[in-house]
Regions:
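Glycine-rich phosphate/diphosphate-binding loop of Rossmann-like nucleotide-binding domains
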Residues: 76-175
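Glycine/serine-rich phosphate-binding loop and adjoining beta1-alpha1 elements at the start
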Residues: 1-104
Length: 175
């Protein structure tokens, strides 16, 4: 089953090969009400199915997964699948190098839903190795098109420039 709520990308709307719904997506509140109705209907007809939220925008992907994860069987491969496979690679790489995940500092090049999902899994895995979540989060940084996200970005926007090279050198993973 495929749920299409439209697109706000004008290039897609004008593209004759675009197969999606050629209208703007509704505002968030209206969109989520529509998804609520869809999820309720699917659960009524197929109560044991798993709903896969595929290719939603980053903030919507995270919000929808959080909204339904304790209500229905649901999954987002960008957030959960990519994160699970990548975390497995990190853990197995550390078996070769002899390190522990809790000792690593990780820099993400990108701060989308896949990166956020993986970062959350890394925090959880570091927790299983005895590291407190707030300490684990301090070992993770995200770098997007505007630079390093979080504390460093605020400093930069206030005028205290931090070079991207130094950010990468300080927070690069050692795996």
């Amino acid at each position: 089953m495929y749920l299409d709520a439209g697109t706000n990308n004008e290039t897609y709307v004008r593209d004759p090969l675009y197969v999606g719904l050629r209208q703007h997506r509704p505002p968030t509140e209206e969109l989520y009400a529509f998804v609520d109705e869809f999820v309720d209907a699917v659960q009524e007809v197929f109560p044991n199915c798993c709903i896969h939220f595929e290719d939603w925008t980053g903030s919507d992907a995270i919000a929808l997964l959080a909204r339904y994860r304790n209500k229905v069987s649901c999954y987002n491969d960008d957030i959960q699948g990519t994160g699970g496979v990548t975390l497995a690679g990190l853990i197995n790489g550390l078996k070769i190098t002899g390190g522990q995940l809790r000792e690593q500092r990780v820099l993400f090049l990108g701060a989308g839903s896949a990166a956020i999902g993986l970062a959350n899994l890394i925090v959880s895995a570091m927790g299983q190795e005895g590291l407190a979540p707030d300490v684990a989060r301090q070992q993770i940084r995200m770098f997007d098109t505007k630079g390093v996200c979080g504390e460093f970005r605020f400093r930069r926007e206030l005028g205290s420039e931090i070079s991207r090279y130094n950010a990468v050198a300080k927070y690069t993973t050692q795996v």
